[in-house]
């Protein structure tokens, strides 16, 4: 029908083509053309006219890292009536896509003879409340000014990054600084907390164990010595490198460690406050924790009222 509409006013050898002649050549009834021309736009046509702009804004606000599934979830959370297949189709038409993770680079070679903390996790990286299980790891990022070493501490319940540090070395102090940030953000005393890591020397040090003991936490280390023994921390490291270090907004190398540190601050805030995490139901970590504490506050108030009513 678009062909007829586009060509009906053309003139060939002094004669205007018109609808009737084109329909005769195409073996289409003129009434079919007029019916299609006068028909109201379909719901799909109308939505396809509006949704691309909305999707692009959501993708851009998500640091241009969301793929089909996460952008679809973000669109639904934003109140858009859209399906996953439609999201994929519109993303293709817009020429946008999610970031792709690269193969992990091994940074720690465990010493099987070294004394290490026991494995208290057994590859179960989940918990029923915040501050029951933290996981931590060190990774590195090359810059023009030298190698930057990055330590993250993640709460297994909500996937919140509770502490982090970017430094020019991978000494124990780098890990201790991340613990200090976590202690400042989560509380000075957290009895029953386990802090899981790989078998790097920083995490086997006496000072590391003593610092955790100060907040009531106990260190633990996986026993096998492969990425699955610290899978959650490895996942966050992978997200960090795909979304920030090699992300769409920074295609080239990082100039200085300070530049990377400032950018990491922004990424951690977005990771905690806005990024959707599939493992926790496609909500941001902050939203999950807020709901947890609100529910427990309500349960506590109900229990107190029940107790008072029985007196």
Predicted regions and their residues:
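Charged DNA-binding/catalytic regions of mobile-element recombinases
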Residues: 1-311
């Amino acid at each position: 029908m678009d062909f007829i509409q586009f060509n009906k006013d053309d003139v060939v050898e002094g004669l205007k083509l018109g609808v009737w002649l084109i329909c005769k050549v195409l073996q289409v009834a003129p009434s079919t053309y007029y019916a299609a021309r006068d028909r109201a736009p379909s719901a799909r046509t109308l939505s396809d006219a509006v949704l691309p702009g909305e999707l692009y804004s959501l993708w851009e606000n998500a640091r241009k890292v969301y793929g089909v599934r996460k952008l679809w979830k973000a669109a639904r959370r934003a109140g858009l009536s859209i399906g996953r297949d439609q999201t994929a189709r519109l993303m293709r038409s817009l020429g946008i896509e999610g970031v792709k993770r690269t193969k992990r680079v091994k940074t720690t070679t465990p010493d099987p003879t070294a004394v290490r903390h026991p494995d208290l996790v057994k590859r179960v990286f989940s918990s029923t409340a915040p501050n029951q299980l933290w996981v931590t790891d060190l990774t590195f990022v090359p810059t023009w000014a030298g190698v930057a070493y990055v330590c993250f501490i993640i709460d297994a319940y909500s996937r919140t990054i509770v502490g982090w540090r970017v430094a020019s070395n991978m000494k124990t102090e780098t890990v201790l600084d991340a613990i200090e940030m976590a202690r400042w953000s989560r509380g000075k005393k957290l009895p029953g907390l386990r802090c899981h890591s790989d078998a790097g020397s920083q995490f086997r040090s006496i000072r590391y164990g003593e610092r955790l003991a100060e907040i009531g936490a106990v260190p633990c280390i996986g026993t096998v010595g492969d990425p699955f023994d610290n899978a959650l921390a490895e996942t966050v490291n992978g997200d960090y490198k795909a979304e920030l270090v090699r992300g769409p907004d920074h295609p080239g190398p990082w100039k200085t460690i300070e530049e990377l540190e400032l950018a990491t601050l922004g990424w951690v805030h977005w990771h905690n406050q806005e990024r959707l995490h599939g493992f926790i139901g496609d909500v941001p970590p902050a939203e999950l924790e807020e709901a947890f504490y609100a529910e427990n506050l309500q349960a506590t108030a109900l229990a107190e009222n029940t107790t008072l009513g029985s007196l």
